[in-house]
Amino acid sequence: MKRTFQPNQRKRKKDHGFRARMSTKNGRKVLKRRRVRGRAKLSA
């Protein structure tokens, strides 16, 4: 059986990167929540 995690930097950045988050209203909400929690890393 193929493993579910197939690492790919491009996919990672495109789906979970900072610019991807900033591009939608809900993505910005995610970043806001992470800032409130004090996360060291806001996005991938």
UniProtKB/Swiss-Prot annotation:
One of its GO terms (molecular function) is structural constituent of ribosome. This is Large ribosomal subunit protein bL34. The keyword Ion transport does not apply. Keywords: Ribonucleoprotein, Ribosomal protein. One of its GO terms (cellular component) is ribonucleoprotein complex. It comes from the Bacteria. The gene is rpmH. The keyword Ribonucleoprotein applies. InterPro entries: Ribosomal_bL34, Ribosomal_bL34_CS. NCBIfam families: rpmH_bact (TIGR01030). Residues 1-44 are annotated as: Disordered. Belongs to the bacterial ribosomal protein bL34 family. It comes from Fusobacterium nucleatum subsp. nucleatum (strain ATCC 25586 / DSM 15643 / BCRC 10681 / CIP 101130 / JCM 8532 / KCTC 2640 / LMG 13131 / VPI 4355). GO terms for biological process: translation.
